[in-house]
Amino acid sequence: GESEMYVTGPNVIREVTGEDITSAELGGARVQEQAGNIQAVVASEEEAFDYVKDLLAHLPTSTFDAAPVVAAQPDEELDDSALDTFMPDDTNAGYDMMDLLVQLGDDEDLVEVQAGYAENLICAFGRIDGRAVGFVANNPLYLAGCIDADAADKGARFIRTCDAYNIPLVY
């Protein structure tokens, strides 16, 4: 990306420590994403607008309003037997919890927040029967899904947001 955020620039770092570092390495978009300072990193301005539109579509206009409800499309491809094979038989094998969340919610309506930060915890807005919900799920593909300090911060922030807007949570 083209975005950077830092307190002291690369020139000062170079003069004080002798370390040669680029602006992107010091405070570029990926660095900020991994530090939990931003919600998402996207490739283009159009993708950024799409992400924001999708995110805001799940939130009410204020904390006094209800979240928008959309007409839920019947899920013709709903196959409960897919849930039977979701988890591997090997208890040491990882699995992507996002696959389950996609099946639980309405089709194509999952917006993950802070996907590049604390990847061991998934926080996402979605819909069930057209109603906005917040999904919080451990992701065994990263740190075996264990909650560390970053994941706890990420989850707490997301839960506070859902609470402020009266959006129910699915754990």
Where on the chain are the PLM-derived regions?
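Short acidic (Asp/Glu) and glycine-rich catalytic loops that position anionic groups and cofactors
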Residues: 9-10, 29-36, 75-83, 134-139
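Phosphate-binding glycine-rich loops and adjacent basic patches that engage nucleotide phosphates
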Residues: 9-21, 57-67, 114-124, 155-164
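Conserved catalytic cores of soluble enzyme domains
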Residues: 1-64
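Short C-terminal domain-edge/linker segments immediately following a structured domain
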Residues: 28-30, 71-74, 164-168
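Non-catalytic terminal/interface segments that mediate subunit docking, oligomerization
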Residues: 93-171
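Short hydrophobic/aromatic-rich motifs at helix boundaries and adjacent loops
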Residues: 1-2, 72-73, 130-131
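Terminal amphipathic helices with adjacent charged low-complexity linkers/tails
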Residues: 44-101
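Glycine- and other small-residue-rich loops at beta-strand/loop junctions that grip anionic moieties
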Residues: 40-41, 90, 144
